[in-house]
Amino acid sequence: MFILYPMLQKSTSHSKTNPKSVPVREWAYNHLKSDVLSGHFNPGERLTEEHLAKALGVSRTPVREALHKLASEGLVQPLESRGFCVARDSLEEVEDLFDIRAALEGYAIRLICDCISEQSLEELNGFIEKAQDALNRKALDEIFEYNTQFHDALHRVISGKTRFHSLIADTRKYVLRYRKDSLYYLDGAKRTIDGHRKILLAISLKDPDLCERVIREHIREAKEDALHKITEDIKAS
């Protein structure tokens, strides 16, 4: 029987070592795209071939190709001078991203509520408790990682619905770079952990309507945090 337990410096998580089986140009592209989407590079941050090639330990050619491909996807923008910068989305575009995420995950959690196992519930609770312990120690990097793992584990429940699962994963990647800032201060991290507790409780009660309301509220709060941060950045620039 599942028991809901009582409430109790930025880094990248991927390796900079290229597996031999992956072409260099593909590896460089995937690595840089991950860094942009994870928020390792901030919107507006300048990116140069020379610096990135040195950091990745590759020649400038695959980096140049990766940057042009990212530019075609709207993730970076070429500068009038040399180099590129990480693209800045408008407030409307960011709001749309969060609204899309809310619609997808609102439906997904209804499916999850019907089929989740006791083992998965325990796993989700474990990530919450680890995040809470990290919050008590003010280990913000760990909180970010455990909260990401919470959502990864939640969506694995419906991984059999391949296309739907892929849509959710892609949307989360684009949202993540605007989400990280609220998790790197204590109040935002605490609010996120509390939101995950509410999600877990709703799922454990097997109430799909409650589940959808709770996760939509969780995403709405995240959207407000992101829009507030972007607005403050615009004022400061």
PLM feature spans:
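Short linear motifs at protein or domain termini
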Residues: 1-114, 119, 163, 212, ...
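C-terminal regulatory/effector modules of DNA-binding transcriptional regulators
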Residues: 1-3, 188-237
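Short helix-capping and inter-helix turn/linker motifs at the boundaries of alpha-helical repeat units
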Residues: 23, 121-122, 187-190
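Residues within well-formed alpha-helices
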Residues: 27, 65, 107, 111, ...
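Mobile beta-alpha loop/short-helix "lid" or hinge segments that flank ligand
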Residues: 72-77, 171-173, 187-190
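Alpha-helix N-cap/N′ positions at the starts of helices
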Residues: 81, 104, 126, 191-194
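Conserved amphipathic alpha-helical segments that form helical-bundle/coiled-coil interaction surfaces
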Residues: 93, 97, 118-181, 194-202, ...
